[in-house]
């Protein structure tokens, strides 16, 4: 790499739930930008972490774990994870050193068959296994897919993550940086909150309200005591839809708010105050400006 060359690109971290994707990203960046938990599915949307190096910018994408989707939200999360495979320059497939390949890994390997980007196998939690066991795991996975590299790491301790970053750097194409060098991440909590509220609208109103509902989080503030204040607007196209969502004496809107609040609190691992409003935005689904404002373009 000469002084005139700059390399940049997007790198997707994929794997089954709770394999350590968020922990790895936080360790590489040297800061906690992604919620981590012992519970699977802590990450519910793609989260970008920007790693700036001399002559290089790596934009990491931490995706939801790929799993068997059951709920609408889970299907959305899996779609987000799988779609990232088609949009990046390098793919990091993260597995655990202390577990054998299972159905979830086979599902991911099947999806990788159509990937055009080079795939690096990252074997996490090497601090938990003996060297002989690690070598067996590396050989087993290498026989399942033509990985560009196989890198053992410990996301918890940071062992060998420097080598991983160097491998990624060498695989990136030439190009200018995508973000200013003082930007660490673009964390879309408000977009995830909007999706959760929208799902509750669909579930609680059933077929009474069509899918022409857009939720916009207009305010997202954290107080000194840790309480997060969220204000969101549920946009509908007709007055009759507004009445259904509000319900008799406001009971339906109250239910939507209560169920959404519980799920958001579990996601963010803190208390929240959720304030919901319903607004008639006539024919918003056909209005280019409104579509842009609501985040659909």
UniProtKB/Swiss-Prot annotation:
Domain KH type-2 intervals: 205-282
Protein name listed in UniProt: GTPase Era
Annotated spans, G5: 153-155
A Pfam family: KH_2
Subcellular location: Cytoplasm; Cell inner membrane
Region listing for G1, in residue ranges: 15-22
Assembly mode: Monomer.
CDD domains documented for this protein: Era, KH-II_Era
Main location: cytoplasm
GO cellular component: cytosol; plasma membrane
Record's function text: An essential GTPase that binds both GDP and GTP, with rapid nucleotide exchange. Plays a role in 16S rRNA processing and 30S ribosomal subunit biogenesis and possibly also in cell cycle regulation and energy metabolism.
Membrane protein topology class: Peripheral membrane protein
NCBIfam families, alphabetized: era (TIGR00436), PRK00089.1 (NF000908), small_GTP (TIGR00231)
Sequence segments annotated as region (G2): 41-45
Entry-linked HAMAP family: GTPase_Era
Residue stretches making up the Era-type G domain: 7-174
Keywords recorded for this protein, A-Z: Cell inner membrane, Cell membrane, Cytoplasm, GTP-binding, Membrane, Nucleotide-binding, Ribosome biogenesis, RNA-binding, rRNA-binding
